[in-house]
């Protein structure tokens, strides 16, 4: 597959609709990526005079900078993780905050990043921010079998987590797991035949688990949710798009607890999902789930 810096933003109209009854002035996009959602918001809502966009991926951020240049000083872009952003003491600032979690199509299709199991000869990197942190390859070659199993079980919800961890540890005794091809070889005999016959690649959940662990996505998400309540202005809305249960479940739980505590109300009593038409155009969005929360004070 040819490498291409292309990303299709998900649930764009649904994101926009949560602000159609107001004229947002300040907005924060903590996963600005290549700028797809940002472009839609800035075009749809001329009332936005300050759009703060951030991302851990410097490559994506450079694309966003080009794409959003036409909006001039309405846009402010930052290379930052959720934890970096949490250091800012701002309060009651934003009318809206958007987080599009997980990995983007652009990151998947850039095979050298190691996010996709289609990149046979590429290194297993998987870092959102390639300037820091450990790679997926380092994780696979250094962690104990019990630790690997826990990652696959908790972050990937892989039914065969124990067998996968065992196979990896046995394989790396004779050869380091560096590339996607190495990981495929290491786990070649692990999955039952029915998993091999499915359209979804058997390593999908393992790749998901490694990505979440490498990027500390669970920790980052917790920090974001807590910080967002502080950043939002009264009546401000937080929109979060997730792609797997390990992302959606903490969001769902946090919103429920925040509502019980009187911080605001859940606007999505039923989770919002892509339409059939959007899934037809962009099959990768099929697992997307959108939730929205409004702060009261």
UniProtKB/Swiss-Prot annotation:
Biological processes, Gene Ontology terms: rRNA base methylation
Record EC number: 2.1.1.199
GO molecular function: rRNA (cytosine-N4-)-methyltransferase activity
Family that this chain belongs to: Belongs to the methyltransferase superfamily. RsmH family.
Xref: NCBIfam families: 16S rRNA (cytosine(1402)-N(4))-methyltransferase RsmH
Gene: rsmH
Keywords: Cytoplasm, Methyltransferase, rRNA processing, S-adenosyl-L-methionine, Transferase
Annotated InterPro entries: RsmH (IPR002903), SAM-dep_MeTrfase_MraW_recog (IPR023397), SAM-dependent_MTases_sf (IPR029063)
Name recorded for this polypeptide: Ribosomal RNA small subunit methyltransferase H
Function, in words: Specifically methylates the N4 position of cytidine in position 1402 (C1402) of 16S rRNA.
Organism: Chlamydia caviae (strain ATCC VR-813 / DSM 19441 / 03DC25 / GPIC)
Keyword Magnesium appears in the UniProt entry: no
Enzyme class: transferase
One GO CC term, this protein: cytoplasm
Domain of life: Bacteria
Binding residues for S-adenosyl-L-methionine: 35-37, 55, 82, 100, 107
Keyword Metal-binding: no
Compartmental location: Cytoplasm
Enzymatic reactions: cytidine(1402) in 16S rRNA + S-adenosyl-L-methionine = N(4)-methylcytidine(1402) in 16S rRNA + S-adenosyl-L-homocysteine + H(+)
């Amino acid at each position: 597959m040819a490498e291409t810096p292309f990303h299709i933003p998900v649930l764009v109209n649904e994101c926009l609709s949560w602000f159609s009854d107001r004229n947002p002035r300040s907005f924060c996009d903590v996963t600005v990526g290549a700028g797809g959602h940002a472009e839609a918001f800035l075009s749809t809502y001329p009332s936005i005079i300050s759009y703060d966009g951030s991302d851990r991926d410097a490559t994506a951020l450079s694309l966003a900078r080009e794409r959003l240049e036409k909006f001039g000083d309405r846009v402010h872009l930052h290379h930052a993780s959720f934890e970096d952003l949490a250091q800012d003491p701002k309060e009651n600032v934003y009318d809206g905050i958007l987080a599009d979690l997980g990995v983007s199509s652009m990151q998947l299709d850039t095979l050298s990043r190691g996010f996709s199991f289609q990149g046979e000869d590429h290194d297993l990197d998987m870092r959102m921010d390639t300037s820091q942190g450990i790679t997926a390859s380092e994780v696979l070659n250094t962690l104990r079998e019990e630790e690997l199993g826990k990652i696959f079980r908790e972050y990937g919800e892989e039914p065969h987590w124990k067998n996968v961890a065992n196979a990896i540890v046995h394989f790396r005794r004779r050869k380091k797991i560096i590339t996607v091809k190495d990981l495929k070889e290491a786990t070649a005999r692990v999955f039952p035949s029915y998993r091999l016959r499915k359209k979804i690649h058997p390593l999908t959940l393992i790749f998901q688990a490694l990505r979440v662990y490498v990027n500390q996505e669970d920790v980052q998400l917790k920090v974001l949710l807590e910080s967002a309540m502080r950043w939002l202005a009264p009546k401000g809305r937080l929109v979060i798009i997730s792609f797997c249960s390990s992302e959606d479940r903490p969001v769902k739980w946090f919103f429920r607890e925040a509502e019980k505590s009187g911080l605001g109300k859940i606007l999505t009593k039923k989770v919002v999902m892509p339409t059939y038409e959007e899934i037809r155009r962009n099959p990768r969005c099929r697992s997307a789930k959108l939730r929205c929360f409004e702060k009261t004070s």
